[in-house]
Amino acid sequence: PTRRSSDLQSIAAKLEDGSPCCEWIGPGGAGHYGKMVHNGIEYGDMELIAEAYSMLKKRTGLDNDGLGDIFELWNRGELNSFLIEITSHILHYKEENGDYLLDHILDVAGQKGTGKWSVMAALDEGDPLTLVSEAVFARFMSSLVNERERASVQYPSGKVGDMEACITLNTSGIEAVRDALYAAKLISYAQGFSLMRRASERNGWNLDYGTIAKIWRKGCIIRSVFLERITQAFTKSPGLQNLLFDAFFHERMENALPALRGMVVDCVFNGIAAPCFFSALSYFDGLRNFTSAANLIQAQRDYFGAHTYERTDSE
């Protein structure tokens, strides 16, 4: 096994310091599970980028070159990643006749099933992998071509009267979309690592989440500088319960949260579908809501099915 590991590491992608993006993850299918969650996160990343693109396209009036410039700029900062980079390339790409290729690609997104597997695993673990779930459902929605065509005719406008949108998409507004994307991305990764933590505890895998984030930093679809921060968070606190509890990410989330709320409101006001952004914000607000409405649900369950309940005022 040692020689085999050495052979694999010798041909693996390397980080800037030369360390390989190949490590032993754990026993009993732990590596396969981690790869599955990686692909689920990939679904979330791609859908969030697509939703940001949709919002910018509909609200700025920029052509594909202008939108490509935005993603190119974002790729120079904290959103630097393979997926942001190729999004810029795709937006800029023109065919020989001068048409943007993207505008001639049918908007039906295929899938191989790994996103669905992640969602199924989350259901089995009882873990709210809400953003990846919405990303999978968004691909299902894209396949409803006939229904979408009919609905676009019957309900041509989804705007809410003449209400002012929360985001004015000038330069500062575009920066707000960038910050909203960062916040939603953070929430998606927090959910993904939470799922791995639950599976690790149940299966006795003792996963090293800092190492997992490290080996994802090169040689894979979700490679990004963002993962370096995740590596640092788990290196500093291996038992970190949720990425949102890390000091750096806490500060970054506090700064980006107004942008996430603003983008969600803007999309609602203007009838723009952004299920993953909506889901990210709902998860965040649900997580920080110490007193939820689940007591009513439990009371309902007891009322019709005698499922019992726990009291808060007695043992």
Each language-model region and where it sits:
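Residue-level marker of structural boundaries
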Residues: 13, 140-141, 286
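Short, well-structured alpha-helical segments that form the helix of a local strand-helix-strand
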Residues: 9, 133, 278-281
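C-terminal substrate-binding/catalytic lobe of Rossmann-fold NAD(P)-dependent dehydrogenases
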Residues: 17-22, 27-31, 35, 39, ...
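Short, small-residue-biased leader/transition segments that mark boundaries at the very start
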Residues: 1-5
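Ligand-binding pocket scaffold of soluble enzyme catalytic domains
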Residues: 6, 10-13, 42
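Surface-exposed beta-strand edges and their flanking turn/coil or helix-capping segments
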Residues: 7, 37, 146-147, 289-292, ...
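C-terminal amphipathic alpha-helical interaction region
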Residues: 254-255, 259-315
